[in-house]
Each structure stands twice: as C-alpha cells, then as structure tokens.
C-alpha cells in the first residue's frame, strides 16, 4: 500500500498573507518571482521575464515582497509588462512574487505570528473581526481574505 505525503487533516501549503480589503488570499503556488527592472505607474515591468510564456493572466496576484504590498493583474501590456490594480512598484529593484488568483476562493486556516486583531472574510462571505488574537495562534475558521482595515496582527500565514 502506498502512502501519500499529504494527510487529510493537515495543511500541505502555506503562503504569507498581505492583508487587503479587496484581494483574496491567492492560490499558494508561485507562478514567477524576480525583481522589477523599470517603473511606471500601476505597472510591473521586468525585462528578464516573459509573462505570456509564464502564463501570467488577468486576476493573478502580485506581491511586492520588498514593501509588503499587493495588487492584481488587470491586463498584460506586453511580454515584459503587466498593468496592475494599484501602484505598488515606485522604485527598482523590488522583489516580487506572482501567484494564481483566487476569485472563487479556497478556504484557508490562519496562523498569526504577532498578536492583534484580525479582520477576515470567511469562506461564507461573512466579515468577522477576531479581537486580541495572541502570538503564535491558529485561527480555526475557513477564510478567503484577511482585510487590511481592522487588522493589527502581523506575520500572518494562510494554510491550505
């Protein structure tokens, strides 16, 4: 009998959470990671990557890892430039990661590294503010998004 490395009651994937009032936690699979090579308002420009070949598409989620900011891809401008929902690249080089979007969200459990309040959108599309979540806490609620407004906790990781 063959045994899988995955167990049904444990998380198999984890992703750092950048809180947003509009963007769901993305699928925890990196499409591409690199550094931007130029700056233009509301764009990600990387002359070293071919976003078409990599399969980056509208709705994918971009993390500016350097600054801890987030945006979605609204369109491809060219093979090396993406139009974004927010101006998250104002200098170079900034490290970024692109993840598959999560429009019909998977449900994630959360780990909170540093204490505070956590404002979430549950998988049932209900907003909830969890008050005074302690350091190193797991939140046993299925969530699709961690909202920026109302969240004071940090070092949050989504588990799938």
Where are these regions (language model features)?
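Short, flexible beta-strand-to-coil junctions
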Residues: 65-66, 111-117, 148-151
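Short, surface-exposed beta-strand/strand-loop-strand elements in extracellular ectodomains
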Residues: 115-124, 155-159
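Short, intrinsically disordered N-terminal pre-domain segments
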Residues: 1-22, 31-32, 155-160
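Beta-rich globular "head" domains
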Residues: 23-28, 50, 56, 102-114, ...
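Small/polar beta-strand repeat architecture
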Residues: 30-54, 63-103
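Surface-exposed interaction regions enriched in Ser/Thr/Asp/Glu
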Residues: 91-101, 147-159
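Beta-sandwich interaction modules
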Residues: 130-144
